[in-house]
């Protein structure tokens, strides 16, 4: 359980109130002021006290000095004489400016924490309309759950994550995750997840996150390092987390040596180190002058590619050029992708999203010899297995026909198959060049 005292320690504001105090990053993400430095800086910074924040932050990552322009949110560092820069998300800039904070709260009956939890409850209820409101309220206020909230000062909740830790089993279940609809373009979601990962690792022995994601959230969780491949043994989590119909179980394995709030800087440093290594075995970094043959546009003559400086050294061959000219995917791929996405998002699609579980339906594969589901179709599409639209339609028909073959006419599954097939047929008919494929 997180106490009010612990929460306050995790969000000390002292380092941001003095404009010239250099911040020292600690492992638990608490910012501490060095006494000697603070006293010196106070004397030197009297003419800047009205700025309300320091301008630059310097830290060392991987042996390189990284300088952050806090006001503009631009990170710079030099590696092997090359300057690298990247721009922080607006949410990071706002946090550095003291406009927002990330606070961990639970139901400890303190007035302020209860206000934050109520704000989170309201956002979850609005952003997750398919969830019963009473169910959301019960879990948010449940004392076995913790929440990390994004708070715009002084006390406006703009989003957050509610999770349940299972410390002895070394994983936590993310129950709800949402950002207010008016705040979803500022990078709060990614920054919030990074804060949560660092907080959980530094305050517990949790190494994994599990969550059930609906079709609209899968993309977000993939970007945050989650995968549909569950490596945790079922005996660890089965029966402990909530199972949602139509949801996709996803897992995130946290890396022990990474500070996720610095992930952007670390990746940039890795890129710089990789470029240095490439320069030792390749000449791809050398910039060569343009070809003289193209200076006179009225007298352009054919040229042997092998005589172009650097091209042969790069490993180019005529066969590679022919391969590059060949289209990687057919013109039907975009249409298939759109139809498949709409199928997956349809209200009647939930029984067909994943393969039928043999443990739950032991005799299914005795009757169905050519099983198919929407996730398998997605994998085939990503692997470029659909050479023509007819192949995709064939698999879709398998999904519907298999369902009707195994289930009786009066079952809900049979009716779901009919509904989804009708929707599928209409979508294909909307595309003129493929409408003739539907009877």
Swiss-Prot record:
Enzyme Commission (EC) number: 2.3.1.48, 2.3.1.-
Residue intervals of the N-acetyltransferase domain: 100-255
GO BP: chromatin organization; chromatin remodeling; positive regulation of transcription by RNA polymerase II; positive regulation of transcription elongation by RNA polymerase II; regulation of transcription by RNA polymerase II
Principal location: nucleus
Keywords assigned: Activator, Acyltransferase, Bromodomain, Chromatin regulator, Cytoplasm, Nucleus, Transcription, Transcription regulation, Transferase
Family matches, as InterPro entries: Acyl_CoA_acyltransferase, Bromodomain, Bromodomain-like_sf, Bromodomain_CS, GCN5, GNAT_dom
Compartments it resides in: Nucleus; Cytoplasm
Pfam families associated with the record: Acetyltransf_1, Bromodomain
A Gene Ontology cellular-component term: SLIK (SAGA-like) complex
Matches recorded under CDD domains: Bromo_gcn5_like, NAT_SF
Compositional bias per record (Basic and acidic residues), positions renumbered to this chain: 1-28, 39-59
The family this protein is said to belong to: Belongs to the acetyltransferase family. GCN5 subfamily.
Record note on quaternary structure: Component of the 1.8 MDa SAGA (Spt-Ada-Gcn5 acetyltransferase) complex, which is composed of 19 subunits TRA1, SPT7, TAF5, NGG1/ADA3, SGF73, SPT20/ADA5, SPT8, TAF12, TAF6, HFI1/ADA1, UBP8, GCN5, ADA2, SPT3, SGF29, TAF10, TAF9, SGF11 and SUS1.
Misc. comment: Present with 1180 molecules/cell in log phase SD medium.
The protein, known as: Histone acetyltransferase GCN5
Source organism of this protein record: Saccharomyces cerevisiae (strain ATCC 204508 / S288c) (Baker's yeast)
